[in-house]
């Protein structure tokens, strides 16, 4: 049974609260080029979901949300331990760690058009999580003449600069929601595809359906430290560039030595311009 099939079973045991309902659900494939520890540059793909109505939206990784939901209660944690116990013999036998239930993406983006605010929750590194709010961006779009079809919808090309990257997107006026993946929004139609110039990041819609699914808030909000956007990005970058050293120090602390014996001087790293979705934190 997959993680996503288990989610309704878990949620059915919880007391229902009244949350706003979406009108549309869009699945996106997020392709990312990233720096993986000392291994250098790698690529990966994650599924993200956009739930949206005319006033608010939520962009999130569904598998990660399911695991966050389990981690938010004692019974959920016990259920996760059972799932882990069930796969560990096969993991030990084959060395296939992909069998271990793990998060696929971390960022949650909530847009509230009524209040003109965006709320972002993200993983920083190790046991650190951060969140921030900012005004809903008034992106300056340049709409072009090029067209193409995505998922059967006629789309128009548009471009914008946002927080250090230049984006080319395709939106469809056939779905008049000023929404899109991640923070991208503000066009007279739903954004179904977005790619930034370097090719390090892209979002491509893979499915779309009408829904009345609830837009539920994030699980365990208290674990997210409030901070400014650029501070969060700088801390993510520090963790990325010093991952091995931070892990070794944490290992020392777990052992109780606190000596820092496993800490190392930073290695000479591969020079690369691979970076996050937003790069203006470096200024």
Label every model-predicted segment.
Residues 58-59, 155, 169, 192-194:
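Short hydrophobic-aromatic micro-motifs
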Residues 130-173, 178-180:
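Extended beta-strand-rich segments in extracellular/periplasmic secretory proteins, especially
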Residues 3-13:
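Hydrophobic h-region of N-terminal signal peptides that target proteins for export
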Residues 13-133, 137-138, 144-147, 199-283:
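Extracellular or lumenal secretory-pathway regions
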Residues 22-27, 153-159, 186-193:
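Short, hydrophobic/aromatic-rich segments at coil-to-beta transitions
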